[in-house]
Amino acid sequence: MGKISSLPTQLFKCCFCDFLKVKMHTVSSSHLFYLALCLLTFPSPATAGPETLCGAELVDALQFVCGDRGFYFNKPTGYGSSSRRAPQTGIVDECCFRSCDLRRLEMYCAPLKPAKSARSVRAQRHTDMPKAQKEVHLKNASRGSAGNKNYRM
């Protein structure tokens, strides 16, 4: 019984081995060499280095990284720890002419703005204006020596 149940398994192994032998003979060693060379020359995403960003691509990347904070094209004053006055480099020098990564882009983001108080200037009504400012406004309006010309400020 043991020989009958293992017979299909043996036939499968034999046919599969013969199939592999035929396929291996048709692939030459030069084909394998070129295949290995191609696989080694393709960079994988994990090993790909930082890229250069210029023009609109650089601005888009900065807007993506910095979000609502905004960004600077030059390093803010007081940036870095060197005491010497080196020529100031900007984001274009660092990311367009050379490659840069996300950390380098983040260095050019503006600092976070502090949260505004609950009662901001926009939240005030026009009637909340102090009387002194209203009086000055009325005095300026009564000086009609402008010859009926409207000036915008």
From Swiss-Prot:
Keywords: Disulfide bond, Growth factor, Secreted, Signal. GO terms for biological process: cell population proliferation; insulin-like growth factor receptor signaling pathway; negative regulation of apoptotic process; negative regulation of release of cytochrome c from mitochondria; negative regulation of smooth muscle cell apoptotic process; positive regulation of cell population proliferation; positive regulation of D-glucose import; positive regulation of glycogen biosynthetic process. SUPFAM superfamilies: Insulin-like. Residues 111-118 are annotated as: D. Belongs to the insulin family. Disulfide bonds join C54-C96, C66-C109, C95-C100. GO terms for cellular component: alphav-beta3 integrin-IGF-1-IGF1R complex; exocytic vesicle; extracellular space. Residues 49-77 are annotated as: B. This is Insulin-like growth factor 1. Coiled coil: none annotated. PROSITE patterns: INSULIN. Residues 78-89 are annotated as: C. Residues 142-153 have a biased composition (Polar residues). The insulin-like growth factors, isolated from plasma, are structurally and functionally related to insulin but have a much higher growth-promoting activity. May be a physiological regulator of [1-14C]-2-deoxy-D-glucose (2DG) transport and glycogen synthesis in osteoblasts. Stimulates glucose transport in bone-derived osteoblastic (PyMS) cells and is effective at much lower concentrations than insulin, not only regarding glycogen and DNA synthesis but also with regard to enhancing glucose uptake. May play a role in synapse maturation. Residues 125-138 have a biased composition (Basic and acidic residues). Forms a ternary complex with IGFR1 and ITGAV:ITGB3. Forms a ternary complex with IGFR1 and ITGA6:ITGB4. Forms a ternary complex with IGFBP3 and ALS. It comes from the Eukaryota. It is found in: Secreted. PANTHER family: INSULIN-LIKE GROWTH FACTOR I. Residues 90-110 are annotated as: A. Transmembrane segments: none annotated. One of its GO terms (molecular function) is insulin-like growth factor receptor binding.
